[in-house]
Amino acid sequence: NLIGDAWVPIGPAPIPNGQVAAGPSTAVSGRVISIAVHPTNPNIVYAGTAQGGLYRTINGGTTWTPIMDNAQSLAIGAIAISPSSPETVYVGTGEPNFSGDSYFGVGVYRIDNASTTATLNGPFNLDAGAANIFSGRAIGKIIVHPTNPAVIFVCSTSGVGGIISASGTTPSRGIYRCDNA
């Protein structure tokens, strides 16, 4: 057997009216940008889409449920599950695959009780000086500290749409750390 000769599509299923440019009755699922698998239950998987939000399956992909429909941005760039507290999931908004139809984000969301009731918190996007550093950008990667789920590292990429810090400068792309997420 060759690696990859038995791939099976598992979703998320096409979204009716998901792409306005293609017409009002076109069913699409969009680009899936990121994926994360629960560290102890492989049937729980999270999938982040370019403009459809975050989806969760609890049955290995048989069915998918959107769990971020009330977020300010449905463009998902990164997903990270806390290794020490897998009910805590961090989601970075903004599509890091910069192209003509990419969407920027508004920061990082934390989802508590992620595999059940999925309580959405955020977006978290302010620096120590209360400047909004992630709106108009994309979050391309999130790493959660292995033993402390409140410590996260975020890679911010692309776009600078209207972001000005308290000092009047545009924040740099790069790696950011938060100790109280």
Protein language model annotation of sequence segments:
Residues 1-181:
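Extracellular glycan-interacting surfaces
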